[in-house]
Regions:
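Residue-level recognition of single "structural anchor" positions
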Residues: 1-289
């Protein structure tokens, strides 16, 4: 079976049913060109039996397939990690820590830890990509119920900025979402500088904070609600995702946005999304280092 093909549930169970199989897959994904010592660059190593680590033949530096990733210093079996990755990747609705703990037979804290690290890898992976071409840009609000009864820009919900790139024929491509403290011009400019390719064509609703953005080709037309179809659809679907899976809670909202975008940006990959997410986890950077 080709590594790039979709992986079925049956194939997943067959391929990743042991610690050694999971470790070999992480080695392949993290070191596609073979072992390279992170300390001295030597390509020769030998395994330290019984400890699941590799030792450089030159400088004797020891490392593992999880060192320096979001799995750094994990005490959970790799098979549990792979199950969590598979369940998180293949369920379009996402999976909560409560459900994951029940499915895998682990405590809530372990399930929460797994999902938190996996979402971190999702966010890191999408940080590598910039939006280009034509991009719809708008701000919105997400999280639990508003306590002051207000809607729109006066609400007390968490503020988010959402961007969706699209083709010339208006087919959606990629999405980025960011939790922000405000939607002032300076904040929006920082998002443009971080997430957009220079000279990208931006469509927005004409709110004054958007009018002086630099580095992009800003369409000064005042777009109505129906004109920014994809960005508003993304915000609507995000709210349904948060409400359905996480019951609207705002805790670690940015991580939930990263999860939503990762899945949206790979919506055409079918079950390949599991392999994409496994690669993201294997090549991630530790939040502990």
């Amino acid at each position: 079976m080709a590594r790039t093909a979709e992986i079925t549930f049956k194939e997943f169970r067959r391929r990743y049913n042991t610690e050694d199989a999971c470790r070999a897959e992480l080695f392949r994904l993290r070191l596609p060109n073979g072992f390279v010592c992170p300390k001295c660059g030597c390509v020769e190593y030998y395994p330290v039996h019984g400890r699941n680590i590799y030792q450089c033949r030159s400088c004797r530096h020891q490392t593992s397939v999880t060192a320096g990733t979001v799995m750094h210093r994990t005490h959970l079996p790799l098979t549990l990690w792979f199950w969590a990755i598979y369940l998180c990747a293949t369920d379009k609705r996402g999976i909560s820590a409560v459900q994951l703990s029940r499915t895998l037979g682990i405590c809530y804290d372990s399930a929460w830890h797994l999902l938190d690290r996996i979402r971190t890898a999702m966010g890191q992976r999408d940080e590598k990509y910039l939006l280009s071409g034509i991009v719809e840009l708008d701000d919105g609000y997400a999280g639990g119920p508003s306590h002051n009864g207000k809607r729109g820009r006066g609400t007390d919900k968490a503020k988010i900025v959402v961007a969706v790139s699209k083709t010339a024929n208006s087919a959606p491509l990629f999405a980025r979402m960011k939790v922000v403290d405000n939607v002032q011009g300076k904040t929006l400019q920082e998002i443009i500088d971080q997430y957009f390719v220079p000279k990208t064509k931006v469509e927005c609703d004409g709110y004054r904070s958007y009018l002086n953005l630099e580095g992009v080709e800003l369409n000064t037309k005042k777009y109505e609600t129906d004109d920014l179809h994809w960005v508003h659809k993304a915000i609507s679907n995000l709210k349904a995702f948060l409400q359905g899976t996480y019951h609207g809670r705002c805790t670690k909202l940015q991580a939930y946005l990263d999860e939503y975008c990762f899945r949206f940006n790979r919506r055409m990959t079918g079950n390949q999304i599991f392999l994409r997410l496994t690669r993201a986890v294997a090549t991630s950077c530790s939040v502990l280092c």
